[in-house]
Amino acid sequence: MQFQIGDMVARKSYQMDVLFRIIGIEQTSKGNSIAILHGDEVRLIADSDFSDLVAVKKDEQMMRKKKDESRMNESLELLRQDYKLLREKQEYYATSQYQHQEHYFHMPGKVLHLDGDEAYLKKCLNVYKKIGVPVYGIHCHEKKMSASIEVLLDKYRPDILVITGHDAYSKQKGGIDDLNAYRHSKHFVETVQTARKKIPHLDQLVIFAGACQSHFESLIRAGANFASSPSRVNIHALDPVYIVAKISFTPFMERINVWEVLRNTLTREKGLGGIETRGVLRIGMPYKSN
């Protein structure tokens, strides 16, 4: 069967566990062609011989997407419940501090989201919009992120920075602790380090970094508050959104329990982890509607 760029495929050698789209075709040193693959719902990049690929039919694609949407909706509902409880708590706190009750307003933390995948960036921006997180989205190749981040931080002045895209671990290239055995972990680490040179304090700029199978420990050591992937598993395309939404909607006087953040994600503690971090939401008053 002839495959083309844009085709939806799965790999026979992996029991067709992940749905991919073909994003490129390259020639190996031996002269044969291989397909470059991006996960359709997970942030995984891979390459494959065409002989290992099988086309995924439309009905199978729809079935997988419906299952994925169901999981996404569960996570979104958890976020909405958390935010509802937060608003009720803050309403009580804000009005109980003053003799005259005034209307108040919320200022959620601003997010700068750098993504190596333009299609995933669009998906993430749609979810940010649904849940009301203020965000600036930038499509940037993983290898160019480190050189771009200082200018972007000056321009957008975010409270939260997301550094993500695609990644993968290859045991043929080295051991699990060897950063050179990962497709883009090194570039994510360099970007975090550059951002931290500019804004060292962990609570002045909250950073999420990583993608599928990323080198979690190196990202945390570089200065990320949250990162992937402790067990080197795949993470969902929207997992970064669920993490930063929780941070964005948590008041800056409160510390965020790491498990409280991870429970809203699709991958949870096998794919994501982090350190104790302050929220970035601020509350003000009075609020005057037009």
UniProtKB/Swiss-Prot annotation:
GO terms for biological process: sporulation resulting in formation of a cellular spore. InterPro entries: Peptidase_U57 (IPR008764). It is an enzyme of class 3 (hydrolase). Induction: Induced by SigK. Its main location: membrane. Its EC number is 3.4.-.-. GO terms for molecular function: hydrolase activity. GO terms for cellular component: endospore coat; membrane. Pfam families: Peptidase_U57. Keywords: Hydrolase, Membrane, Sporulation. Disruption phenotype: According to PubMed:10714992, cells have an altered coat protein composition; CotT, YeeK, YxeE, CotF, SafA and SpoIVA proteins are present at increased levels and/or exist as precursors. According to PubMed:16751597, cells show no effects on vegetative growth or spore resistance to heat, chloroform or lysozyme. The germination of YabG mutant spores in L-alanine and in a mixture of L-asparagine, D-glucose, D-fructose and potassium chloride was the same as that of the wild-type spores. It is found in: Forespore outer membrane. Cleaves the spore coat proteins SpoIVA and SafA. May cooperate with tgl to mediate the temperature-dependent cross-linking of coat proteins like GerQ. NCBIfam families: spore_yabG (TIGR02855). Belongs to the peptidase U57 family. This is Sporulation-specific protease YabG. It comes from Bacillus subtilis (strain 168). The lineage of its organism: Bacteria, Bacillati, Bacillota, Bacilli, Bacillales. The gene is yabG.
